[in-house]
Amino acid sequence: MNIKSNYIKPKFKKESNPKVGLLALSTDLTIEKDFNSICYKLPLDIFVNRIHNENPLTKENLLKMYEQIESITEKILPGEKINTIAYACTSGTIAIGEDQVKEKIQLAKPGCYVTTPITSAIKAFNKMNIKKIAVFTPYPESVNKTISEYLIKKISMQRHLVLLI
């Protein structure tokens, strides 16, 4: 039996793709699919961990996630650097506070860029000079009130804003 063998030298990428961590709610059934659809064809690697959230959706229950953020973030590629962490909870970010969410995430992953849906939305409103928005949410009135107050405070400081809820 004659076996021919060829050596092929592997060609590895010198740089790895940027690593994106996604903090998803334990009750969110679509975020991974949605996130992958948005990031389709981008040269990045996505790593997900879930954070426990409680029903019913109230500001008090949203605030309970604050204490979990650091430990859940640490479990995304433990000991490894991650370029970006996306905390996928608009209402939780608003209830807890963008700066507090960022602080907790960066305790677990120092130097990473932190984003949330509301952070990205506000950046987009500013970049596109949006002057009028409509907000449609699945939230109860008490949470909607918190969101509308936040948007009015965050955006109207920069320019005149009409908020339709």
Where are the model-predicted features located?
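N-terminal glycine-rich anion-binding loop in soluble enzyme alpha/beta folds
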Residues: 1-71, 141-144, 148-165
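Conserved beta-alpha
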Residues: 101-104, 108, 112-165
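A general structural motif
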Residues: 17, 43, 82, 111, ...
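Glycine/small-residue-rich loop that forms an oxyanion/phosphate-binding "nest" at active or ligand-binding sites
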Residues: 73-117
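Glycine- and other small-residue-rich loops at beta-strand/loop junctions that grip anionic moieties
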Residues: 24, 94, 136
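Short active-site-adjacent helix-start/loop capping segments
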Residues: 55-58, 93-96, 124
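Alpha-helix C-cap/termination motif
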Residues: 38-41, 79, 108, 127-128
